[in-house]
Regions:
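Cofactor-binding beta-sheet edge motifs in enzyme active sites
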Residues: 38, 68, 72, 79-85, ...
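Signature of N-terminal electron-transfer/Fe-S-associated modules in redox systems
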Residues: 1-105
Length: 167
């Protein structure tokens, strides 16, 4: 992070919306499948917010250029859903669309399989409350068992014995 002046206001993903009142960018990221693993989502949302504060009506190319210039990287989405979300959120922020227009509505038949139903974990990811890696292990109860992955040294072999003494 670049040096911040004393008493400067620093806004983070946790401060732009809540579960009850999402920011348009948070809602759009959920609706347009811009949240996959979610690791990059807070950075993209905050970066997009900065863009829309400077340019409320960007083109798709300007959105992509902004993310490139500011070092936002995602390995999961292919970027199209992220740009879609920014464009739709921008329309809400300009007053051209309502939040309901960018909110997932279940199909009339109630079918969710094959629909664009947002991932159940999307909300925690756009709010910045999702735990990753060491965050999770720090919250586990004492005595929790852990898994160690051991890869085979051969493609095909018959297991004759396992030494579980250290397990």
């Amino acid at each position: 992070m670049k040096q911040v002046k004393a008493y400067a206001k620093v806004e983070t993903i946790e401060g732009i919306g809540s579960a009850e009142r999402l920011h348009p960018l948070q809602r759009a990221f959920m609706t347009y499948a811009s949240v996959q693993c979610g690791f990059c989502s807070p950075g993209f949302i905050m970066s997009a917010k900065g863009l829309l504060m400077r340019n409320p009506d960007p083109t798709r190319e300007e959105v992509r250029e902004w993310f490139t210039r500011h070092g936002n990287v995602c390995r999961c989405t292919g970027y199209k859903p992220i740009v879609d979300a920014v464009m739709e959120a921008a329309a809400v922020m300009r007053g051209e669309k309502a939040m309901e227009d960018i909110t997932f509505t279940p199909p009339e038949d109630g079918r969710l399989y094959g629909s664009d139903f947002p991932k159940p974990t999307a909300l925690s990811r756009v709010l910045g409350t999702c735990d990753f890696g060491a965050d999770i292990s720090g919250k586990m109860p004492e005595g929790t068992l852990h898994l160690a992955v051991v890869l085979a040294k051969r493609e095909h072999a018959r297991i004759r014995a396992l030494d579980t003494a250290e397990a």
